A protein has these predicted regions:
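Trp/Tyr-centric glycan-recognition "aromatic platform" motifs on solvent-exposed beta-strand/loop surfaces
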Residues: 100-102
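Oxyanion-binding/catalytic loops of NTP- or PPi-dependent enzymes
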Residues: 1-98, 107-114, 119, 126-649
Length: 649
């Protein structure tokens, strides 16, 4: 049986593309109108009517804003509690459902964001089938590198709803590097991929060596992109319109009313703002015409590139911290890079290109693209080259097509090694996180450890899966919990193997197995980090800021656990050997025990971790005092074993 061709898809916030490899050449497939970019826009004309997708939907967005969905990628795989800021960017009703998921209400029906994305994917599927001339059922779909597990799963679901078997979920910057790397397979080079799209930003650092693409690190923000620039321009124009005597469109609460007269006006302003932003990448000033914005009001404004840059400079600057973190994770400096690749339509903006050139101390460009200031201090003759040779809108889709070809058996001299951006582990006794897969581990990856019980007669073990960079479980994010049952046994006897596996799509599977009975549970983690990217970055920052405090906490918790075990063993020995030790020795043991018990109790009562060094010293003293007791207990245990075997009477 001949397998169908695998296509590569860039499912974007504003535009989506489908690509394939034909006769060894990756290319983007055009639709029936000859357009290679398909707007990620879906219009629902009536409750029972088929949705309109792409350019046709985009054309009616201004007229029917409450029934036309765009930028659905911003909501995919997210909880309703996270959407308050983003819902101000759209003109259709978005809300959090009772289950916590985000839904979009059109004509009285609630749609999940993945259902909207599925309609876009169906359109791409039809376009690909028309071009190839055969059914297309397999796809590689790209996502932002910093998408969490829930967002990746939702993207995969969207592909399946569209009729695809999703062969692989690939990070967008990694796919772009594949597209740029085709003609340099034998070079060894380090590349930074600066990917600023309409809804997301990623900075990935990769090493290309003899056809192997190894992702060294990735960092980003899935809530930062060109949409934020559009909103800033819209807010600016709204104030200008109000000052010119036009309608007051500053009441954001009206946006939530699908029947509001503001929606068509705001939709027109948003479209005009987006077009002006695009034109200002090649022009220094543009007219923003809004004729008959209201029945008796028309408006025109001449927007300059300088005004645009002043309005949006702080948004672009927010990408800086992600770039520096990614470089730090890769243990590199800008001078260690060979190239910086620009990906995403927003990187056409001259301000972005100047910002990137300055941040990475790029060497001079051969062409004045982006109006890079030549001979400025931040340009180094031996710095990395700012590579703009690929179409930034198409690079990701082309890379996805190349990955699809690799999976099909083509391009055998290429290999893609991606990474996971955050550490994964489980909670252990005492409330600590035990890391099983560290952050920036190359995926796919599989790792595991063996754990045991800390309580006598325990009949089950709760596996609490965590993600984050802190020492204490409570400071990290909970991905899920499940229980593995086993036979009752003394503490330390059961042995439970826990294995984490991150597949090539970046999706986590957790296996827990009782090594005695082989009883096991396998859980697919469907909801990863249910927080926004500000919280993701807060986690990384706090892991550095609180590193010393976390280390103290871990040292205290581990020492306190050992202290409790030692106390229990010593108390047991005093009971079992009550007739074989004198009163003076018992008093010495009791005093040493009391010292340790008091230190543990004081540490538990305090708001800060106790003094681990002082507790360790007290434990050492207790160990020395109880050594004769331990020897006596060992002798009694050996005698019992010999008597059991009939070797002594």
């Amino acid at each position: 049986m001949v397998m169908s061709r695998i296509v590569g898809i860039d499912l974007g916030t504003t535009n989506s593309l489908v690509a394939t490899v034909d006769s060894g050449i990756p290319l983007v497939i055009a639709d029936a109108e000859g357009q290679r970019l398909t707007p990620s826009v879906v219009h629902f004309p009536a409750p029972a009517a088929d949705p309109v997708v792409g350019h046709a939907a985009n054309r009616v967005r201004v007229l029917k804003p409450a029934e036309t969905v765009y930028s659905a990628k911003r909501f995919i795989g997210r909880r309703g509690s996270e959407i308050s800021q983003e819902e101000m960017l759209v003109t259709y009703p978005v809300k959090g459902a009772a289950t916590g998921a985000v839904t979009i209400d059109i004509h009285g029906r609630e749609y999940a964001p993945e259902e909207i994305s599925a309609e876009v994917l169906k359109k791409l599927k039809r376009d690909a089938e028309a071009f190839i001339g055969e059914p297309v059922t397999r796809a590689v779909i790209t996502v932002p590198a910093y998408f969490n597990d829930a967002q990746r799963n939702a993207t995969k679901t969207a592909g399946e709803l569209a009729g695809f078997t999703v062969e692989r979920i690939v990070n967008e910057p990694t796919a772009a590097a594949l597209a740029y790397g085709l003609d340099r397979l034998r070079e060894r080079s380090r590349i930074a991929v600066y990917d600023l799209g309409c809804g997301t930003f990623d900075l990935s650092v990769l090493e290309l060596n003899d056809g192997v693409f190894h992702v060294l690190s990735t960092n980003g923000n899935t809530r930062l992109g060109g949409d934020d620039l559009d909103k800033r321009i819209v807010d600016f124009l709204v104030e200008k319109i109000k000052a010119a005597g036009g309608p007051d469109l500053t009441d954001k609460s009206e946006i939530r009313n699908p029947k509001s007269e503001m929606l068509p006006m705001l939709s027109r302003i948003r479209e005009a703002a987006e077009q002006a932003k695009i034109k200002l990448s090649t022009e220094t000033a543009v007219e923003v015409p809004l004729p008959f914005l209201a029945s008796t009001f028309s408006f025109t404004y001449r927007l300059t590139r300088q005004e645009l840059e002043d309005l949006t400079r702080d948004i672009i600057a927010r990408t800086r911290v992600h770039c520096l973190r990614s470089l730090a994770d890769a243990k590199l400096e800008p001078k260690d890079l060979d190239q910086v690749i620009l990906v995403g339509g927003q990187t056409r903006m001259p301000l972005v290109r100047r910002f990137v050139a300055e941040l990475f101390a790029c060497a001079e460009l051969e062409e004045p693209s982006g109006e890079i200031r030549r001979d400025s201090d931040y340009h180094k003759p031996k710095g990395p080259r700012l590579n703009t040779s690929q179409n930034p809108d198409e690079a990701v889709a082309l890379g996805a097509a190349i990955q699809a070809e690799i999976l099909s058996g083509g391009f055998k001299n290429m290999l893609l090694l991606d990474v996971t951006p955050l550490s994964l582990g489980i909670e252990t006794f005492g409330g600590l996180m035990n890391v099983i897969i560290p952050r920036n581990s190359t995926i796919p990856v599989k790792a595991g450890e063996v754990f045991t019980t800390a309580v006598d007669n325990q009949r089950s073990m709760l596996i609490h899966v965590l993600q984050g960079e802190r020492e204490r479980a409570s400071d990290n994010w909970s991905l899920g919990r499940f229980t593995l049952d086993f036979e009752s046994a003394p503490k330390g006897t059961p042995r439970v193997g826990v294995q984490f596996e991150i597949d090539a799509n970046g999706i986590l599977h957790v296996l827990a197995r009782d090594l005695k009975t082989a009883k096991q549970k396998v859980v697919k983690i469907k909801s990863a980090v249910d927080v926004d990217d500000a919280e993701v970055q807060k986690m990384v920052d706090e892991s550095v800021e609180h590193a010393f405090e976390d280390l103290r906490a871990r040292q205290w918790i581990e020492t306190a656990l050992r202290a409790r075990q030692t106390i229990a063993a010593a108390r047991k020995g005093l009971v079992e050997c009550v007739g074989e030790i004198d009163a003076d020795y018992r008093t010495k043991v009791e005093q040493a025990l009391k010292t340790v018990e008091n230190l543990v109790a004081d540490g538990e009562a305090a708001t800060q971790p106790g003094d681990a060094a002082k507790l360790k010293a007290a434990l050492t003293a207790l160990d020395e005092v109880t050594q004769p007791l331990a020897d006596l207990m060992m002798d009694k245990a050996m005698e019992a074993q010999l008597r059991k075997r009939g070797l002594v009477k």
